[in-house]
């Protein structure tokens, strides 16, 4: 994966266009599909590919929880979980597990029946889109419905490469939701990803409410500059890979 990603970056550095890099990415995706058919011992390759192909479209939704029922008619979690795990173990996707409550220790609150899926390579996420959507994202910089999922994927990829196990929280019957969490000593740090430097209501609630005793401060990633206000550290999205070093 790292060699292939380097080839994409090198091509772009030479040509300053996406034509060559996109061709490389398309070939990587083609190779992935071939590997699925070749190495999916004991699993249905069609099911694995259906999950793989559906990741970008589920990230485009407002509710980014991955819904197996949307992958294929009659699809059920118990029939597809092995496919999801296969893709994760192959280094193709990243699983972000739901928490039943944002509290330490995180492992005691993980619910693997609910999760979000991100592509392990954000460039390949964009390459999976159709031609029109790719031109919107790459050329016109018009992210539209892809903005939230794309920025979340960028941050998720950086956190995983920094050794963070991904988890998120969505409170039932509420708008309270948090994209990621990070443990720093005895603190549980919520991490929210914003397309712009917008207000982070969920972050404020988690920090100020007495119902979340492990949470005292948080991090907000934005398409903007560094700042710190009301116990919220604001960072540009590109710096996500530095987060464990910054807060550790």
Where are these regions (language model features)?
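Accessory nucleic acid-recognition modules appended to NTPase machines
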Residues: 2-185
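Residues immediately flanking
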Residues: 122, 193, 223
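Switch/connector loops and helix/strand junctions flanking conserved nucleotide-binding motifs
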Residues: 127, 200-201, 227-231
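Nucleic-acid nuclease catalytic cores
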Residues: 171, 213-233
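Active-site ExK catalytic segment of metal-dependent nucleases
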Residues: 188-198
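Active-site-adjacent loop/helix micro-motif of nuclease/hydrolase catalytic cores
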Residues: 197-206
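Domain-level recognition of nuclease-like catalytic cores that cleave nucleotide substrates
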Residues: 224-248
């Amino acid at each position: 994966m790292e060699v292939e990603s380097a080839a994409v970056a090198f091509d772009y550095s030479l040509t300053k266009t996406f034509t060559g890099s996109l061709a490389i990415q398309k070939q990587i995706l083609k190779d992935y599909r071939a590997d699925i058919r070749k190495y999916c011992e004991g699993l249905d390759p069609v099911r694995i590919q259906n999950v793989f192909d559906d990741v970008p479209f589920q990230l485009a939704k407002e509710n980014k929880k991955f819904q197996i029922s949307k992958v294929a008619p009659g699809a059920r979690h118990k029939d597809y979980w092995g496919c999801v795990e296969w893709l994760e173990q192959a280094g193709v996707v990243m699983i972000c597990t739901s928490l039943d409550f944002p509290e330490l220790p995180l492992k005691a609150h993980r619910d693997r029946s609910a999760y979000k899926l991100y592509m392990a390579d954000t460039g390949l996420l964009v390459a999976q889109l159709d031609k029109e959507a790719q031109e919107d994202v790459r050329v016109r910089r018009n992210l539209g419905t892809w903005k939230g999922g794309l920025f979340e994927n960028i941050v998720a990829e950086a956190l995983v490469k920094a050794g963070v196990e991904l988890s998120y929280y969505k409170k039932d019957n509420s708008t309270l939701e948090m994209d990621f969490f990070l443990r720093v000593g005895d603190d549980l740090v919520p991490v929210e990803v914003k397309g712009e430097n917008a207000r982070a209501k969920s972050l404020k609630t988690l920090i100020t409410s007495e119902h979340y005793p492990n949470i005292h401060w948080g991090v907000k990633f934005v398409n903007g500059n560094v700042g710190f206000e009301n116990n919220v550290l604001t960072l540009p999205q590109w710096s996500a890979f530095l987060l464990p070093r910054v807060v550790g």
